[in-house]
Amino acid sequence: MPLARPVASPGIARRLASMCYESLLVLAVLAVLFVLPHLMLGVFAQRMASPAIIQVHCFLVLLVYFVWFWLHGGQTLAMKTWRIRLVSSDGLPLRPGQALLRYLLSWPSVVLGGAGLAWALLDRDGQFLHDRLAGTRLILA
């Protein structure tokens, strides 16, 4: 069901708190998914772990993590904790293409040290650039 009335966007402080909490959760997920192959494969895993393979592994693990949570309720655990929900710009749940596009478009902001926060400060609705481009928006849940 589309949003019947405008819904408030979370403030920058709430988003930053959610991002900090999310980074701890993601670090734990990545740690587990790096330790398991090393335990199962032993020394062989160390020989296979080139920097490029590690980067692709991280990218794919994070892709699955975020896209799955966004498609199943619009919230990661950190977003639930801070009462933030991701919806399409018309208020409906995300479609798979939107979730994937948002994930891919968010990387320049991550690589540039969170430059997307500056955009959100200037945006009339307080949304990130990658949300505008992907047709998504963050709302208070």
Model-derived features: where do they sit?
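Membrane-interfacial and juxtamembrane segments of integral membrane proteins
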Residues: M1-A141
